[in-house]
């Protein structure tokens, strides 16, 4: 799968916006420099708002960005640990970014499930063996699992728990992803594996891929103010 693996490409961004709880973007030769993650037919841009550290609040906007524009602590482990020292942060849970998305939806939604599973396993291997390794527990690994099959999800929980991972990310509202709700029994193998391995289940706001809003033309502030309502709906 090496030739189909996710990769970063620099492509000008002609448009980027966030209105009515919907994120929109497009490429264009006359646009601003932007780094994009490409995966199969997907192009997902890097944005200032998701790498806001170090910028004045007035500059934290929904605009394109590149890795050179970001503070190195966003992607470089020694720099991250140094930033944590500066901020007096002892440890942090490492959620996925907007490319794999908050519970790994990107890999779970790809039509080729063999490729999706390979990406999930590779992501978890990187998380455990590279990003969080040799940090004295300060960077806490958070695994993702294949959401299309609860038995496969359970197997991935067991695989990572065997090497000390004790946290998994899950969707706040799986029904919004077109998956069975937590009330159906569908997820029982996954939850049973978590319980048996003493793995805690974590849910990031927005992990249902649906952001609340009041109208199609509502400004970003409206969706931001209502975002925490998703957590209230997670049961």
Task: Describe the role of every protein-language-model region.
Residues 1-235:
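Helix-coil boundary/capping segments in enzymes
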């Amino acid at each position: 799968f090496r030739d189909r693996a996710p990769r970063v490409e620099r492509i000008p961004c002609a448009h980027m916006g966030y209105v009515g709880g919907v994120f929109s973007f497009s490429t264009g030769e006359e646009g601003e420099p932007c780094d994009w993650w490409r995966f199969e037919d997907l192009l997902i841009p890097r944005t200032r708002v998701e790498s806001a550290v170090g910028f004045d609040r007035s500059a934290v906007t929904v605009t394109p960005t590149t890795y050179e524009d970001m503070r190195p602590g966003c992607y470089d482990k020694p720099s991250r640990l140094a930033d944590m020292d500066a901020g007096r942060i002892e440890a942090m849970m490492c959620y996925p970014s907007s490319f794999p998305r908050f519970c790994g939806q990107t890999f779970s939604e790809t039509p080729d499930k063999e490729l999706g599973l390979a990406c999930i396993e590779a992501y978890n291997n990187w998380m455990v063996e590279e990003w969080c390794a040799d940090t004295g527990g300060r960077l806490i690994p958070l695994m993702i699992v294949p959401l299309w099959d609860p038995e496969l999800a359970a197997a991935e929980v067991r695989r990572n728990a065997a090497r000390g991972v004790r946290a998994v990310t899950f969707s706040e509202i799986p029904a919004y992803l077109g998956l069975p709700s937590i009330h159906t029994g569908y997820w029982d193998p996954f939850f049973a594996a978590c319980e048996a391995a003493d793995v805690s289940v974590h849910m990031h706001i927005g992990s249902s891929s649906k952001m609340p809003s009041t109208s199609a033309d509502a400004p970003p502030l409206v969706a931001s103010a209502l975002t925490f309502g998703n957590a209230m709906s997670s049961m």
